[in-house]
Amino acid sequence: MSQALPTEVLAYVALGANLGDARATVLQAVNDLSRLPNTQLVKASSLYRTAPFEASGPDFINAVVALMTRLDAGELLLQLQHLENCQGRERPFKNAPRTLDLDILLYGDRTINTATLQIPHPRMWERAFVLVPLAEIAPERVPQETLLRVADQPIERL
């Protein structure tokens, strides 16, 4: 059973998949995220197609969602890992192709640095597949100069 926080926090979560029917998997994950306990889906970005970043394999389908949640960050992470596991997620090596990848990008304005969780996500500012969909739903969270730094990374809005 999840422990609810006394106040809600606006969290941003990145979604990605490149195995199986990646588009259907990401859309299902958005639906699953909307049903998490003590959580409400606020907004979802468009879907985007990107080549694997520092990896090989099929193209990824990516998106970002905004969630209003009373789950603490650690519990939210556990819920995301559960959804990944339900989609058959395996972690054989770093940047391996994946059925579903869910990452907490931002959790309110909080900074968290534990052995299992780093928020803001430590590599989010380097990746167009995160920044472009995040800027679509929360432009105030992505400085324009940051978007310009990743402009050379190919990304296609679907």
Locate predicted features:
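N-terminal beta1-alpha1 ligand-phosphate binding loop
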Residues: S2-T39, S45-R49
